[in-house]
Swiss-Prot record:
It holds the Pfam family MFS_1. GO terms for cellular component: plasma membrane. It is found in: Cell membrane. The keyword Transmembrane helix applies. Its main location: membrane. The lineage of its organism: Bacteria, Bacillati, Bacillota, Bacilli, Bacillales. This is Uncharacterized MFS-type transporter YwoG. PROSITE patterns: MFS.
């Protein structure tokens, strides 16, 4: 293979590591902050959910503009600036003991998380050879899947052996390490033109062809928010905190194992053969959580949810791109994840309002049954498919 066609270059590895650092932090705090709110701040489950929702809300608000910001000021510069502000603000978790101030910190970090995750994806796309871009971006996406397992596992286990100040210091230093790595990335100069003009037209923020499938994605993520925001607190309530971190390991393992097979089915047979069963499997996994009182059941639930949810999301992201013009694939992806993040943000808050009175079993059972409506929404989204100018594959 020619050196020019290589994927695993120094710069690709560096940007993949930065992305891994960011998402490990994201998934760790997604899991730990609800517990911190209850134990250290004397807050409620709904307040813990609000910390998650506000972070995602600020990311959602910023995301439609983050692409223009990155192009206007340059990818390398924005990678360093956004990583620096995210890392340095992480040290503020230690002195803050006021819930309102903590909300402000989460909102601030959400802004830079949005820009940072936008710029790492853009840099990765620039670095990967054009003829191997699908394969390379598939590897890049796996860093997020790996973080989904590492973050909660590391956070929940570390939280049990150190105090919260030590915990927050460790992860702030972890992000500083990510900042140092970002300095080592070399971005192709021609890609940073700095000539982008800010505009506020709908078409400069969203892709119309992706809106229907993005709506289905929003519904899926709304139900999935019960896992991201409340799994750790639920595990504590049923005396399973010691193994709750392994839930996410099982989740990530089945998700990564399933992806190559579901990708081939998607390409050869069509999206329905993957999405319909995956929604049903996801529903079963959530319902299993509602009846969980043993470690084995918790781990099995994680594996089942990972199999279902892990198959749905990449298929829907691919559909969002396929239903859009080829030159609008970036906007299609941004549209899908804007809706997806919105579902998690709203779900974290809404389910948090009811968990204190209804209990965790009730919200997981409700989410498990509620997600079945996505079967009808998906059918609706496919009734009048838009003609795409290009096709992409998730079988890479």
């Amino acid at each position: 293979m020619k050196k020019a066609d290589a994927i695993w270059t120094k710069d690709f590895i560096m940007v993949l590591l930065v992305n891994l650092f960011v998402f490990v932090f994201f998934y760790t705090f997604l899991t730990v902050l609800p517990i911190y709110t209850l134990q250290e701040l004397g807050g409620t489950e709904s307040q813990g959910g609000l910390l998650i929702s506000l972070f995602l809300l600020s990311a959602i608000i910023t995301r439609p503009f983050s692409g223009a910001i990155v192009e206007r000021f340059g990818k390398k510069r924005m990678a360093i600036v956004s990583m620096a502000l995210f890392a340095l603000s992480s040290f503020l978790y230690m002195p803050i003991h006021n819930f309102s101030l903590l909300l402000g910190l989460r909102f601030f970090q959400g802004i830079w998380f949005s820009i940072l995750t936008t710029v790492t994806g853009a840099i990765a796309a620039d670095i990967i050879p054009a003829k191997r871009r699908g394969e390379g971006l598939g590897y890049f996406a796996m860093s997020m899947n790996l973080a989904m397992a590492i973050g909660p596992f590391l956070g929940l286990n570390l939280m049990r052996v150190v105090s919260f100040p030590v915990f927050f210091t460790a992860f702030a230093l972890f992000m500083v390490a990510g900042l140092l790595v970002s300095f080592l990335i070399k971005v192709p100069q021609s890609k940073d033109s700095g000539t982008t003009v800010f505009r506020f037209a709908f078409s400069d923020m969203f892709e119309k062809g992706a809106l229907k499938i993005a709506t289905v994605g929003l519904f899926i993520s709304f139900c999935y928010s019960t896992v991201t925001s409340y799994l750790s607190v639920f595990a504590k309530s049923v005396d399973l905190s010691d193994i709750s971190g392994y839930f996410f390991v099982c989740f990530a393992v089945t998700m990564m194992i399933a992806r190559p097979f579901t990708g081939k089915l998607f390409d050869k047979v069509g999206p329905g053969i993957v999405i319909y069963p995956s929604i049903l499997i996801f529903s079963v996994g959530l319902c299993m959580l509602s009846f969980t009182h043993s470690g084995l059941m918790l781990l099995l639930s994680g594996a089942v949810i990972g199999l279902g949810y892990g198959s749905i999301v990449p298929c829907m992201q691919t559909l969002a791109i396929q239903k859009s013009p080829a030159h609008r694939s970036g906007f299609a992806t941004a549209t899908f994840f804007t809706f997806f993040d919105s579902g998690i943000a709203v779900g974290s808050y809404v389910f948090g309002l009811f968990v204190a009175s209804a209990g965790f079993s009730a919200i997981y059972l409700t989410a498990g049954l509620f997600v079945l409506i996505a079967l009808l929404l998906y059918t609706w989204s496919q009734k009048k498919p838009a003609e795409a100018e290009g096709k992409v594959s998730i079988a890479e």
